[in-house]
């Protein structure tokens, strides 16, 4: 079944800093095989955080991607990407902002 990857402007802006084109393709293939990889972020309505290897670093020291999977449409909404060394977890305000952004985006796409 075909999947669609929708990138936020933030994800699009920073992706090249963290992932090579090949690493990005591998990440997409991994998500298509197992769309619910990563941990659900509590209090966000289903957003997930996944560890990815980035630019020669392993998954543990690599990057984190926040995404949402809309199952009925096989859409992956890629919201943001950041290095593990930059931030460990999202704070309450960031979670709230991402959830609001995702809700608006999802309503726009339906």
UniProtKB/Swiss-Prot annotation:
Keywords: Toxin-antitoxin system. InterPro entries: HigB-2. Transmembrane segments: none annotated. Coiled coil: none annotated. Induction: Induced by amino acid starvation and the protein synthesis inhibitor chloramphenicol. It comes from the Bacteria. Toxic component of a type II toxin-antitoxin (TA) system. Inhibits translation by cleavage of mRNA. HigB-2/HigA-2 has been shown to stabilize plasmids very efficiently in E.coli. Three hours of ectopic expression of higB-2 results in bacteriostasis without any detectable loss of viability. This is Toxin HigB-2.
């Amino acid at each position: 079944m075909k999947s669609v990857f929708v990138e936020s402007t933030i994800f699009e802006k920073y992706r090249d800093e963290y992932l090579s084109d090949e690493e990005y393709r591998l990440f997409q293939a991994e998500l298509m095989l197992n769309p619910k990889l990563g941990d659900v972020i509590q209090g966000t309505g289903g957003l997930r955080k996944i560890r990815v290897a980035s630019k020669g670093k392993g998954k543990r020291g690599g990057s984190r991607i926040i995404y949402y999977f809309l199952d009925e449409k096989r859409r992956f909404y890629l919201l943001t990407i950041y290095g593990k060394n930059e931030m460990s977890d999202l704070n309450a305000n960031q979670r709230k902002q991402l959830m609001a952004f995702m809700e608006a985006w999802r309503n726009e796409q339906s």
